[in-house]
Curated annotation (Swiss-Prot):
Belongs to the ORC5 family. ORC is composed of six subunits. ORC interacts with cdc18, recruiting it to the ars1 origin of replication. GO terms for cellular component: chromatin; DNA replication preinitiation complex; nuclear origin of replication recognition complex; nuclear pre-replicative complex; nuclear replication fork; nucleus. It is found in: Nucleus. Pfam families: AAA_16 (PF13191), ORC5_C (PF14630), ORC5_lid (PF21639). Its main location: nucleus. One of its GO terms (biological process) is mitotic DNA replication initiation. ATP binds at residues 42-49. This is Origin recognition complex subunit 5. Disulfide bonds: none annotated. GO terms for molecular function: ATP binding; ATP hydrolysis activity; DNA replication origin binding.
């Protein structure tokens, strides 16, 4: 396939990427001058991978695709490349675990090929051991190892400046799609637009059906466009989800496709329905939460359970209320707080009655659980732990710190400290488990969690 033919075919399959298609075709698929290495970068959902795969499918060029998210170490990375180019598994495992052995085996394998091969390193910036040295070694590999029939393609999400250094490599940038481009792509890639009636016959012309799809795309962009953040895949998933519901009145024969006003009115009704909002906000039914929690066992030590409850209280209670909740009286009993039982637990907002000095304005009190968890210092966590645990569970402070580290490794509490801690700084954490999970732990400890939560 000639170069201009490849460009034309790519433009028919990949929309709104004319500049990137032209650069990619000239740098990679021009047989007279192919670059040894090239960088494609841009945020997610910008057609980097899709354009590459489409170009390889149309040109029938040999390519080796390595996703760096599936590689754990550099040795595993070398091993996967060698296996893809035809090196024996045992030889690759024994000799290809370092850079010198990898280059030797790769050179031997590529010398047996009389055709050009493209090595695609997808999401290399997500590789745990990615570094400037590794990037430099790979970028100069075709030249240093004298492998003229090899080109390396780096696909990144972030800017390649931190990896390039002083290297001179061709870079192709994939910007985020604009609103007009996303709508253009959606309108050029419609789903099946045959509006079949109940008898199975198509009763409308193709132009009318396409017009309905274009109106639908514009309508949903006005509703979900801001939330999708110019992400084509996110917006397309929304389109595919609500499309059957949108055309249901047309299929049932209740509305003509040209009656856009009535279609939009019905669409607004189901977009704001309880079922739709619940699905959009990922709200789980309380019964499903209970069944999910009952099916899970809490395999934590007694100290870890008390620490997790303490972390939850420290995240959702203001520090000024610690003395009220966790101080001891003369009888060595925790004061706690006698809370009034709320009849409707689903109410999150309660208005304060108006007074004469409020000038007609009403304040709104928001629950701490609604505002979300807040960071706390580790000293405050330990103080609450010693206040709520019984004397039997009060172990040494060193063991408590070990259990805190365990909870942090399990991602049940997350570090909230900014930057590098200085010698006098106190580590800060934030709880990362749900209220339902902590309630189950508190029930296993016979601890009245709700009595120690601020309203």
């Amino acid at each position: 396939m000639h170069l201009y033919q490849l460009e034309d075919e790519l433009k028919k399959n990949v929309f709104c990427r004319e500049d990137q298609i032209k650069k990619l075709s000239c740098l990679l698929f021009n047989k007279d001058c192919r670059v040894p290495s090239i960088v494609l970068y841009g945020v997610a959902s910008t057609a980097k991978t899709f354009l590459l795969r489409t170009a390889f499918d149309l040109s029938k060029e040999e390519n080796v695709w390595i996703n760096l998210q599936d590689c754990f170490t550099v040795a595993h990375f070398w091993y996967r490349i060698l296996i893809k180019v035809g090196v024996d598994k045992d030889i690759a495992l024994k000799k290809g675990i370092n850079i010198s052995g990898f280059i030797y085996l790769l050179e031997q394998a590529m010398s047996k090929r009389d055709y050009h091969t493209f090595l695609v390193l997808d999401q290399i910036d997500d590789f745990a051991e990615a570094s400037t040295i590794l990037f430099s070694q790979l970028a100069q590999l075709p030249i240093v190892a004298n492998i003229p029939n090899l080109s390396i393609i780096f696909v990144l999400h972030s800017h390649p400046a931190q990896y390039l250094g002083t290297l001179s490599i061709a870079v192709i940038f994939f910007p985020q799609y604009t609103q007009a481009e996303i709508l253009e792509i959606c309108q050029k890639t419609p789903p099946n637009l045959d509006f079949l009636d109940r008898s199975g016959d198509s009763v409308f012309e193709d132009e009318i059906e396409l017009s309905v799809w274009m109106q639908y795309c514009s309508f949903l962009w006005s509703v979900f466009g801001v939330q999708c953040l110019n992400d084509y895949r996110s917006f397309r998933s929304v389109l595919d989800r609500y499309w059957p519901k949108f055309i249901q009145p047309i299929v049932e024969g209740d509305i003509h496709p040209a009656d856009y006003a009535q279609l939009h009115k019905l669409a607004k009704n189901f977009l704001v329905s309880d079922a739709t909002v619940t699905k959009r906000l990922h709200i789980i039914n309380p019964t499903e939460i209970k069944n999910l929690l009952d099916s899970k066992s809490i395999n934590l030590s007694l100290v870890s359970k008390y620490l997790l409850v303490s972390a939850f209280l420290a995240s959702y209670n203001p520090s000024r209320l610690d003395a009220q909740f966790f101080s001891f009286s003369k009888t060595s009993k925790r004061r706690g707080r006698k809370r009034k039982q709320i009849q409707d637990e689903g109410v999150l907002f309660s208005k304060i009655p108006r007074t004469a000095g409020s000038k007609g304005r009403s304040a709104v009190k928001i629950s701490q659980l609604t505002l979300g968890p807040k960071p706390f210092e580790v000293e405050r966590l330990i103080a609450i732990y010693y206040a709520i645990s019984s004397p039997v569970e009060k172990v040494l402070t060193a063991d408590v710190f070990v259990q805190i580290a365990t909870l942090a490794s399990l991602k049940m509490i997350l570090s909230a400290s900014k930057g590098v801690l200085r010698s006098l700084d106190s580590p800060r954490y934030i709880v990362n488990v749900s209220r339902e999970y902590v309630l189950k732990i508190a029930d296993s400890l016979s601890f009245p969690l709700d009595s120690y939560l601020a309203g």
